[in-house]
């Protein structure tokens, strides 16, 4: 399997730690001594034959510096698009070079604590992908979260394939519906991990989104030539923005062509400060007198009588919220304009 690592997005729910100039995949949020993108590369090394990171031009140099010496290729997008363009471009480049190979897409900014379980899931997904399925790895839910999309799993594929047919993908539900999903035992969290043959993906794009397919093939055909820059500049801005779930996974699932490997591997997307607080306790030197609070600061901070408080200090900004309202941080950051826009 050849790994594709999309490294994009600002991670605004983790503001002021994550910014446009230094998004969360460049940060060491888990306290492991490595950036999230480097940890992702290292995690994939035992189960991949190399990796391609797709990131924005503004962050390409920083990403390259963090993965120096790993042999990983960094592909720079000239302007922001979405997951389908990033994954499709890397898959098309690999297909142009190597033919019909298995590719797997794994986000640059997730944390997985049980890497052995992750490796088992990836190997199972690779075997299913070789049989022609678009394969995803679904996370066994630990709570009725409304922060994630869900995957409804159906019948088992049957030996030797260790997975199940995907019935459908569900958008983020409200809390009540998420609780209903958990009672059925049929639903998994959608972590956005996809494993498939490059030919299967490109054939799906040719059928479902022919203009995107033509554009990606044109760029891939010129990628290893002197004409790369010209073709990229001419074609990339014309590509319609799409997410891979809606572009490929959902319509292929409707015809029974998507499979899922259920996994319990200590996964977190660290999507907000509630998730970060669950993963990385506050530094012990800080005095916190409210249950479940989380503090990131250079000075001692005392929190009294505010359960689940979140206090984050950086040199130029301070955030005060609660874990309950952690998902709402992005909406406030999006309103920063005028002289405050530089803080985004």
Where are these regions (language model features)?
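Left-handed beta-helix
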Residues: 198-344
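A short acidic, often aromatic-flanked loop/helix-cap motif at beta-alpha or helix-coil junctions
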Residues: 80-85, 143-145, 175-177, 267-268
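Short coil/turn connectors at secondary-structure junctions
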Residues: 1, 48-49, 70-71, 98-101, ...
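Conserved core of the sugar-phosphate nucleotidyltransferase
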Residues: 115-236, 256, 322-323
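Conserved N-terminal catalytic core of the sugar/cofactor nucleotidyltransferase
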Residues: 1-5, 13-17, 25, 30-117, ...
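Residue-level signal for inorganic ion chemistry
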Residues: 37, 90, 109, 151, ...
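Fold-independent oxyanion-binding glycine-rich loops
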Residues: 7-9, 56-57, 78, 106-108, ...
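Conserved beta-strand scaffold positions in the cores of enzyme catalytic domains, especially
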Residues: 26, 74, 134-136, 257-260
């Amino acid at each position: 399997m050849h790994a594709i690592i999309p490294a994009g997005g600002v991670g605004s729910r983790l503001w002021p730690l994550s910014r446009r100039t230094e998004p969360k995949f460049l940060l060491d949020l888990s306290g492991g001594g490595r950036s999230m993108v480097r940890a992702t590369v290292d995690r994939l090394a035992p189960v991949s034959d190399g990796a391609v990171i797709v990131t924005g031009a503004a962050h390409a140099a920083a990403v390259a510096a963090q993965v120096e010496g790993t042999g990983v290729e960094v592909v720079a997008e000239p302007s922001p698009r979405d997951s389908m363009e990033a994954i499709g471009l890397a898959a098309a480049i690999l297909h142009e070079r190597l033919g019909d190979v298995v590719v797997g897409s794994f986000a640059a900014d997730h944390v997985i604590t049980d890497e052995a379980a992750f490796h088992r899931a990836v190997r199972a997904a690779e075997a299913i992908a070789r049989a022609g399925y678009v394969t995803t790895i679904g996370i066994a839910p630990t709570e009725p979260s409304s922060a994630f999309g869900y995957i409804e799993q159906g019948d088992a594929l049957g030996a030797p394939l260790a997975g199940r047919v995907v019935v459908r993908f569900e958008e983020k539900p409200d809390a009540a519906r998420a609780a209903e999903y958990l009672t059925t035992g049929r639903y998994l969290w959608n972590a956005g991990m996809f494993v498939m043959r490059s030919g299967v993906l490109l054939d799906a794009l040719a059928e479902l989104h022919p203009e995107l397919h033509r554009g990606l093939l044109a760029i891939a055909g010129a990628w290893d030539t002197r004409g790369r820059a010209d073709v990229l500049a001419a074609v990339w801005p014309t590509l319609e923005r799409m997410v891979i779930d809606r572009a490929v996974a959902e319509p292929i699932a409707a015809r029974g062509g998507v499979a899922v490997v259920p996994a319990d591997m200590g996964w977190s997307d660290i999507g907000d400060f509630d998730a970060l607080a669950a993963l990385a306790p506050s530094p012990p030197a800080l005095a916190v007198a409210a249950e479940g609070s989380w503090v990131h600061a250079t000075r001692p901070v005392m929190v009294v009588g505010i359960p689940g408080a979140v206090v984050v200090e950086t040199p130029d900004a301070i955030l005060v919220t609660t874990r309950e309202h952690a998902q709402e941080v992005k909406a406030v950051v999006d309103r920063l304009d005028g002289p405050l826009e530089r803080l985004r």
